[in-house]
Amino acid sequence: RFLYMPGIIDSPDAKNFYYKELKRFVNELESLFGKRITDDDLREAIQIYDENRSMIMKIFHDRKNDRPIISGKEAYLITLSSMLTDKQDHNKLLKELLQKLPDREPLKQGVSRVMLVGSPMDNMKLLELIEDDIGAWVVTDDTCTGTRYTWGETPSTYLEKDPLRAI
């Protein structure tokens, strides 16, 4: 079965629908694997994911500088690797990267600064065209596989009493 997510996510009805979907999903996982998922398990996972998003946002923030030290292609690969790698392992890698980035040389001067807007990107061809062929910098984006992936921490208002609602 699928985990359904409403198209409009800001309304109270959509939030309640999604909460019920998450509860159903947790119940199915518990039944399938014979292991209870506790509130503490959820809180720990939320903390790990929030830490991951926070570190990615720090890296992405550098792209706005006059001379960024990370390219749009590299930013895309960081996000993609976050989607495909165990979050605890990815957090370790991000911590190492954050320690090394200040020593990195800024990118060579680009011809233009570009904001990429669109839907999820499933490959890097557009980024390669912009950065390698044209010589511009993709300094920010508004895509699901870019900055939107890191938007917002989990609301702490629900975290203590109902971590599933916080998700």
Which residues are covered by each model-predicted region?
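Short, charged, surface-exposed secondary-structure boundary motifs
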Residues: D10-A14, T147-T154
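A charged, amphipathic alpha-helical module
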Residues: Y19, K23, N27-G152
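Gly/lys/ser-thr-rich phosphate-binding loops in alpha/beta enzymes
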Residues: R1-E28
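Acidic, Ser/Thr-rich peripheral helices and adjacent loops at domain boundaries
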Residues: P155-I167
